[in-house]
């Protein structure tokens, strides 16, 4: 289905953009597309018309409270997100008693599916890296902080352009500057900036997203994260982000140009003042 088409049972477009609650019909068939951070993305298909849409909801009862908090924060920001760079929810609903967001259908591949595999050519890496930077730059120009940049929040379209999703931790600059943590607590430890942890008193701003971007790009280029933790060491990510220095990418992968290696290491600077200041 073309992403601009809408099924016959889809509510009026104007109502959707007003944040109308969308009531799911009983005969809709759901198929899990991806799971990330306690949230499941599902394709919802009407068996008679063949029309479809996408919903996001908690993966389990155990994750429901946190996932609902994230989804509601994302929904509250829907009017400042733009379709040109964001996967934007257009309505909310209930799925099996759980809060859920509704999205128009779109074709994508989560960048997380490529995690752990280094991109084979430097030119291909640079092309993808630029496409990842484009929506993040647009988001920052809207005075918004993402707060959870990771492979699971980056959507790669069939034409290789990228969109951002998973805005559960996102907030406006003005909200972030008033505190040391983001508006909604949480995050994904492996990609979290030092200031986003509980162990520093530095405010979280857009440069926190740049650190997380550096983590994402480092893994795409080298096939591994800057810090390798054992299965029993996963609770210590904050320590590694604050106190450990990553190996230079050109040490891990000799074909990486020195300048590119330097760029990634600058993104991963511990203090935000020492990073690039904008995308």
Q: Which role does the model predict for each range below?
A:
Residues 44-68:
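ATP-binding glycine-rich loop module of kinase domains
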